[in-house]
Every structure is written in C-alpha cells, then in structure tokens.
C-alpha cells in the first residue's frame, strides 16, 4: 500500500475498461463480406465442428464471426451483418453473424426462439 507522499507524487491511475467489440465502432451492427467460411474445433472439454466465417467489415476490420443455428448458406463473398457477442469455447471469435439478414438465410424448421435465428412463423 502506498504512503501519502507516494500518492502525492504519483496519483492512482484510473482503470479504463477495454472495449470487447472494437470492430463495431460503437455501432449495434456492422456489414461485411465473408472472405473465408470454415469450421473450427472448440477448447477443451468440448468437442464439435463449429461453423465460423472470416468477415471483412465496411470499416476495414477483418474479424471472425460465429454462424449460429443448424445449417447455413454462407460462402465466400456473401454479404453478412455482424453483432457483438463472443463464443466462450472458441478463442478469437468475438462476433456473431445475424441470421435472416442480407445474404444469410434463416434457420429452416425452427419453432422456438425464431427471432434469434431469422426464421419466419410457421403456418
């Protein structure tokens, strides 16, 4: 613990919280173009092939976005919208790709939580 004299000489530094989604530039979503669509494996103890895409955003950032839901139609040069939100078991994946927006189709046969996956209401 510092003495009073030490604090007078050098006051305490204010701890600034770092931005968890710097590529969004304080916007709720950003548009981008897929440069690579691939699968990757999660950290231990989980095991799967998670679908992700490398996206070049309109502001020049290149980020990795997670593609949620079962099945997708994304390929290289698809135009997508990303939002913030990391995937805990995929290191480096700090963004989600929005389903049912721009070139990304919604999840087929989705009955519950449809708004999260861009699925229309079943007839």
Swiss-Prot record:
Gene from which the chain derives: rpsL
Record keyword DNA-binding present: no
Pfam family, one: Ribosom_S12_S23
InterPro entries listed in its UniProt record: NA-bd_OB-fold, Ribosomal_uS12, Ribosomal_uS12_bac
Gene3D superfamilies on file: Nucleic acid-binding proteins
Transmembrane found in the keyword field: no
Top-rank taxon, per record: Bacteria
UniProt similarity note: Belongs to the universal ribosomal protein uS12 family.
Assembly information from the UniProt record: Part of the 30S ribosomal subunit. Contacts proteins S8 and S17. May interact with IF1 in the 30S initiation complex.
Keywords: Methylation, Ribonucleoprotein, Ribosomal protein, RNA-binding, rRNA-binding, tRNA-binding
HAMAP family: Ribosomal_uS12_B
Entry-annotated residues carrying 3-methylthioaspartic acid: 89
GO biological process assignments: translation
GO cellular component, one term: small ribosomal subunit
Name under which the protein is recorded: Small ribosomal subunit protein uS12
Role summary: With S4 and S5 plays an important role in translational accuracy.
PROSITE patterns on file: RIBOSOMAL_S12 (PS00055)
UniProt GO molecular function: rRNA binding; structural constituent of ribosome; tRNA binding
């Amino acid at each position: 613990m510092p003495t009073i004299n030490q604090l007078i000489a050098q006051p305490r530094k204010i701890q600034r919280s770092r931005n968890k989604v710097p590529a969004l530039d304080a916007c709720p979503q950003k548009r981008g173009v897929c440069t690579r669509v691939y699968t990757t494996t999660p950290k231990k103890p989980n095991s799967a092939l998670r679908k992700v895409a490398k996206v070049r955003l309109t502001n020049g950032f290149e980020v990795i976005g997670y593609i949620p839901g079962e099945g997708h139609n994304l390929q290289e040069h698809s135009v997508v919208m990303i939002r913030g939100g990391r995937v805990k078991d995929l290191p480096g994946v700090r963004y989600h790709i929005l389903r049912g927006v721009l070139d990304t189709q919604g999840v087929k046969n989705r009955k519950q939580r449809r708004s999260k996956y861009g699925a229309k209401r079943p007839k």
